[in-house]
Amino acid sequence: MRNLYPRLAATNLKKNRRFYLPYLLACIVIVALFCIMLTLASDPYLGQMQHGGSVSQVLGFGVSIMALFSAIILFYTNSTFTKQRKREFAIYNILGMEKRHISYVLFWESLYTAAMALFFGLVAAGVFSKLLQLVLMRLIGGEATFGLNIRLMSIGCTVVFFGALFLLLLLNTIRIIHLSNPVQLLRAGSEGEREPRSKWILALLGAVCLAAGYLISLRTNVALYAIQNFFPAVILVIIGTYLTFIALSIVVLKALRKNRRYYYKTSHFATVSGLIYRMSRNAAGLASICILSTMVLVTVSTTVSLYKGLDAYADVRWPQDMTLTLMTDPRTNTVPDVAPVLRVVDDTMTRAGLTQSNVHGYRTVRFSAQRSGDALDLTSEQLTGSSADEYAVMVLDTEGYADLTGEQVTLSPGEALAWTDGAAFGDTLTLGGDTLRLRPLDSFSLVSGSSIMGLHTLYLVVPDLDSVLELRAQQNAYANEHGGTRSMLNYTYQFDLSGTDDEQLDALHTLLSDPAFESSAEAANVNYTTDMRADGYPTLRSTYGGFLFLGFFLGFVFLFATVLIIYYKQVSEGYDDRGRFRIMQQVGMTPKEVKATIRTQVLLMFFLPLVTAAIHIAFAFPLIKQIVFAFGLQNVHLFLLCTLGTFGVFALLYTFVYLLTARTYYRIVRMTD
C-alpha cells in the first residue's frame, strides 16, 4: 500500500500539469531568485570593496523582501492549485481513501515538488548568479571577479528556508482537507455562483481608505515628511484597493443593472450580469495584480530616475573636487586668520604633484529660521524638515559672492541680494530685528546640503563681513536667551584638482595626517571638515547602483508574480466559462455574440488592475517625488519621464502576457467535456 502513494502522487501531478507546471515553475524561479539575492548580499568581495558596505546593506534589505514575498506568492499559487483539485480529493474520499491516505499522497507530492524546485532552482542560481554579479559590479563601478559566485552558506540557507516553507504549505493543504467533508469538496468548484450581495459598508470603507491615501500623497510637500507618510499611505491604498475590488465593484455593477436604459441592451445586459459574478470570484486576485503592478511601477521608476540623475546630483553635491570648511568656535566673535591653514593645503597639493584650479574662498554664516510671509523668525533649533516654512539661512558678503561668481556688486547698508528654492520673498525681508531691502537673484552657484535634502534654503548676500557678523550676533543672542545651538562663522575653501581619483585621495590622506595642518588649525582656533568628490562619488554610485539593481530585481519578481496570477486567473476562468458558453448559446445567443460578450468581460476584468495601478501612480507621484528629492534628485522632469516610460513598457508587457494567456483561455473554453 505504501508503495502506491509515491506512484499515485506522480500520476496526480502529471494529470494536473496544466495547473501544476506553472506552480512548479514559480517554485523554481522563487528559489533561484532568493538564492541569488542571498549570494550577492553575502558576497565577501562587496565587503572588501572600499564602498561596498552600502551595497551589502541595500541587498540585505532585498533578501528580507524576497523572503516575505516568497512565502506570499508560494502560498497563493499553492492555494490556487489546491482549490482546483478539491473535487479530485472528494472523489478519492468517496471511493474509500481516508483523509490520512490523501495526506500521504500530498506528502509525496510536496516532496517531489520541493526536490525539483530546490534542485533546478539552485542550478539556475549557480548559472545566473555570476551574470547578475557582473551586472551589479557594472552598476556600482566595481571590478568583476572570476570563479563561481554561489557559496555553500547561501545554498544551505536556501534549502532550510524553503524546506520549512514547503512543510508549511503541506500542513496548510492537509488542514484544508481534514476540515472539509466530501460534499463540501465536491461543491467547491461551484462555490460563489450565487449572486454576491452589495456590501455598502465595505465599499464605503474602501473609498474612504483610497481617498485618505491619495490625500496624504497630495498634501505632502516636505521631503522628510514624505518618508514617514509613505507607509501609512501605502497601507491605506492597499486596503482601499482590496475593498474596492471586492465590494465597491459589485455595488457599481449592481447600480448599472438598476439603470434600465443602460442595462436592457443586448451587449450591456450580458456583460454587466456576467461581470457581477466574475468580480465576485476574482476580486482578491485582481486587487493583488493591481498592487503588484503598482509595486513594479514605483520600484523601477524611482530607482531608474535616481540612477539617471546621479551625475547631476553629484555636480550639486560636489561642485568642485575638494571642499575644506573651517569652522570657528561659536563662543567667540573674532574672525580667525585662516591663511596659514590654506598655505599648508596648497603646499600639500603641490608636493603631491596636483594642480589646483578654480580656487574659491568665502565666509558664510548659517542658521535656522521659521518663515512667516516675508519675515523670518530666528530659531536655535536644528532643522528637521518637519515644516514647509522651515528655512536654512546662508549669509555671505559681497567679497565672497564676487569670488564665487566673478560678479562685482555694490550694496548699500540694509540691502541684500536674495535667492531661495522656496516661495519668492517680496521687496523686503524682516529678519530678527532688522528689515532688509531685497534684490532677487535669478540663480545662485552655491547650493548647500539642505537644498539637496529637500529643505528650503535662503541665500543672502550682504554688503560686508560686518553685516554677516551682525546677523550672526542676532542669532547667537537668540540662542543664548532661548537655549540651543549658536551659529558659526565658516570659511569654505574649494578648488578643482588634476590627477586621478586615487592621487587625489592620497593627497587628502597626506594632508589629514600632516602635523603642520593640525597645528595651523589649532593656532587659528578652527575646526575643519573635508569633502572630496573622489571619496564621496564612488560611495554614492555604489548606493544608487545597488538601489537600481534591487529595483530591477524586485521589479522582475513582482512582474513574475503578476504573470503567474494572470495565468491562473485565465485558466480558472476558462474552465468556469465552458459551461456558460453553452448556456448562452442555448438561450438564443449566437456563438459570435457569446464570444464577443465573454471577450468584453475578460478584457474589462483583466485591464481594470492596470488602469487602477495607473491611477495609484498618478496620485502617488507627489509623495514619491518628495522621497526622491530626499535622496538628491531635484529634476522633476526626469522623474516624470522615467515614470511614464516605466508605465509604457509595463503596459506593453502586461498586454503581451494577457494575449498569451488568453490563447490558453480560449482553448479551454472551446474544449468539450
Which residues does each PLM region occupy?
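A short amphipathic helical element positioned immediately N-terminal to and/or at the very start
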Residues: 5-16, 270-278
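Short cytosolic juxtamembrane segments of multi-pass membrane proteins
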Residues: 3-7, 179-193, 575-576, 666-673
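Basic-flanked hydrophobic alpha-helices used for secretion and membrane insertion
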Residues: 313-560
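Small-residue-rich transmembrane alpha-helices
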Residues: 31-43, 76-78, 87, 113-142, ...
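Alpha-helical transmembrane segments, especially those used as permease/efflux helices
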Residues: 21-26, 32-36, 160-165, 194-306, ...
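Hydrophobic alpha-helical transmembrane segments of multi-pass inner-membrane transport and secretion
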Residues: 18-45, 53-87, 110-124, 238, ...
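Juxtamembrane interface at the cytosolic side of transmembrane helices
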Residues: 76, 82-84, 176, 222, ...
